[in-house]
A protein has these predicted regions:
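N-terminal Rossmann-like dinucleotide-binding module
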Residues: 1-18
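Beta-strand-loop-alpha-helix segment that lines the small-molecule cofactor/substrate pocket
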Residues: 43, 49-50, 54-102, 116
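Conserved hydrophobic residues forming the short capping helix/wall of the S-adenosyl-L-methionine
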Residues: 12-16, 84-87, 113, 168
C-alpha cells in the first residue's frame, strides 16, 4: 500500500522477479482504508509521515486490526490518549516499533545489565546524533522539514531513550518524574528552510539535550 501507484508497481515487480505471486495492492489517498477494512488480515503496519500515524492507527483498530506503527506513534499528548483509548475500547494491540531497542548492541547491553554485570545502574546516557541536512526535504511535500519548522524539541527521542528505559526498568518498577530540556539555536535548519521553503523562522534547534530524573 502506497500513496503513489508507481511505487506499488515497483514492489510488485520485485516479487515477480523473485518468483512470488503479486500481492494485493492499494494506492491513492484512501487506499489504506480499503486495506484496513479487509477481513483476512490481523495486523496493519504503518510506515508513513508522522501526522498520519494516529488517524491510520485509530482507523485500523476500529476495523478490528492490531497495529504496529513507526516512531513517533503520536506527536502530542492528546494523540497519545487517543491511541490508548481506542486500543482499550477495541481491545486491539497498538505497538510503537522503536527499532533501536532491537539492535544487536542494545540487546546485548540489556542482557548484560539484567545479568548484573554492571552492578547497580545509577545513570545512563542515550543519544541520536544524526545530520539530517540531506533528509529534511527528501520526503513528499517536505513534510519532515515543515514539521520541524513548527515544532521544537526531541521529536522522536525514543531512539536513544528507549534502550535506556529498558536498562532502568522504566514502567517495570521505576518511572520518570521530571525533566529539564535545553537546546541550541537553529542554524542549519533555518538555513535549509530559507532555501527550500522561503521561510524566515524555524522552531527546532540543531541540538537538543534533555536531563531526566
Amino acid at each position: 500500500c502506497d500513496l503513489y501507484p508507481e511505487r506499488v508497481d515497483s514492489a510488485q515487480a520485485i516479487l515477480v522477479r523473485r518468483g512470488f505471486p503479486e500481492a494485493a495492492s492499494y494506492s491513492g489517498e484512501e487506499g489504506w482504508k480499503q486495506l484496513c477494512e479487509r477481513d483476512d488480515i490481523d495486523l496493519v503496519y504503518i510506515v508513513t509521515p508522522w501526522l498520519q500515524h494516529v488517524p491510520m492507527a485509530v482507523y485500523a483498530m476500529e476495523q478490528g486490526k492490531h497495529v504496529a506503527v513507526e516512531v513517533p506513534a503520536a506527536t502530542s499528548l492528546e494523540e497519545c490518549w487517543q491511541l490508548v483509548n481506542t486500543a482499550e475500547k477495541t481491545q486491539r494491540h497498538c505497538m510503537m516499533l522503536e527499532n533501536c531497542v532491537y539492535d544487536f548492541f542494545e540487546l546485548t547491553t540489556l542482557n548484560m545489565a539484567r545479568q548484573g554485570l554492571f552492578g547497580d545502574i545509577l545513570h545512563v546516557e542515550g543519544s541520536y546524533i544524526h545530520d539530517l541536512d540531506a533528509f529534511w526535504d527528501y520526503y513528499q511535500d517536505s513534510w519532515r522539514l515543515k514539521f520541524n519548522q513548527k515544532h521544537r524539541g526531541d521529536v522522536y527521542a525514543t531512539h536513544g531513550l528507549g534502550p535506556a528505559c529498558q536498562v532502568l526498568d522504566i514502567h517495570r518498577g521505576d518511572k520518570m518524574n521530571y525533566l529539564v530540556s535545553m537546546d541550541t539555536k537553529s542554524v542549519n535548519g533555518l538555513k535549509l528552510a530559507e532555501e527550500k521553503l522561503g521561510a524566515t523562522e524555524f522552531a527546532n534547534a540543531d541540538q537538543t539535550l534533555t536531563m531526566i530524573k
